[in-house]
């Protein structure tokens, strides 16, 4: 497989789609399995060893909360 290109994309989901993805993520975390998700046409495999954090940003009247999963590919 070739080297993956850098990318930084955001995908907007409906409430029901987002809830379904969060449920699948929670199930994967509880069972210690990897989490699969497709974002903007690319399937991503999040390993069980990933680190998780919550980030809060505020700028003027706008606020943002991000749930982040980070890992390094071996």
Label each PLM-derived region with a short phrase.
Residues 2-8, 34-38, 42-74:
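N-terminal intrinsically disordered, cationic/polar leader segments
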Residues 1-20, 24-25:
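Terminal, regulation- and interaction-focused segments at domain boundaries
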